[in-house]
Regions:
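Short beta-strand/turn micro-motifs composed of small residues
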Residues: 37, 70, 146
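Structural microenvironment flanking redox-active thiols in thiol-disulfide oxidoreductases
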Residues: 48-99
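A short, polar/charged loop-to-alpha-helix boundary motif
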Residues: 160-175
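Thiol/selenol-based redox catalytic cores and closely related redox-interacting motifs
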Residues: 91-161
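N-terminal "domain-start" segment that seeds a small globular fold
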Residues: 1-25, 51
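Cysteine/selenocysteine-centered motifs that mediate thiol-based redox chemistry or coordinate metal-sulfur cofactors
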Residues: 179-181
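Short loop/turn microsegments at loop-to-beta-strand junctions
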Residues: 10-11, 33, 139-141
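Short active-site neighborhood of thiol/selenol oxidoreductases, capturing the structured segment around
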Residues: 24-53, 66
Length: 181
């Protein structure tokens, strides 16, 4: 399947988190910030998710539900994402990645900005090399999905540290705009 675009109406997804909780996208009561990350031990991803965790109350107050997908198994994700206060979903077969057009690229790890973020992430202790079936070449992607299933905004990352910040997300949710990248 190709890339998702703003204004596109998504079919309903029924997912299960790594803790066994059901997640429905779209959520009839909340905007959904659907994030695609790399592998469970990714230092850049885990550093980014800690920033989401620190400001999770603000995100919830803005009417947004976080749903984060990794191309890892539940077992691989538990040590790294098991304590997060939002939904995390294992997609080791990358079915959701294909459905949403989320790619891989050597540039994911070659861009200089990724090196600094990776070092900062390793320093937090929440990092490990890719495990069996995982890849360091995954690119991140972000989607803001309305209660009706319409894509309000999206971003396909060009390298491993190219994703929306919390400020970006809150701004987009407030404006309900349609930027592309």
């Amino acid at each position: 399947m190709g890339k998702i675009h703003n204004g596109q109406l998504l079919a309903r997804l029924d997912l299960t988190t790594i803790t066994g909780e059901p997640v429905q996208i779209p959520d009839p009561d909340h905007l959904v910030h659907l994030q695609f990350r790399r592998f469970a031990g990714c230092p850049i991803c885990n550093l980014h998710l800690r920033s989401i965790t620190r400001r999770h109350d603000e995100i919830v107050a803005a009417g947004i539900r976080e749903v984060v997908v990794f191309h890892s198994t539940v077992a691989a994700m538990q040590p790294y994402q098991g304590d997060l206060p939002f939904a995390t979903v294992a997609d080791p077969d990358r079915r959701l990645y294909v459905r949403f057009g989320v790619d891989t690229s050597p540039w994911a790890v070659l861009h200089p900005r990724t090196w600094i973020a990776a070092l900062r992430g390793v320093a937090t202790g929440k990092a490990a090399p890719p495990g069996r079936g995982e890849s360091a070449l995954g690119l991140p992607a972000d989607f803001l999905i309305g209660t009706d299933g319409r894509v309000l905004a999206h971003k396909y990352g060009h390298h491993a540290d190219d994703q929306w910040s919390v400020d970006d997300l809150l701004h987009l949710a407030h404006r309900r705009s349609y930027p592309t990248s």
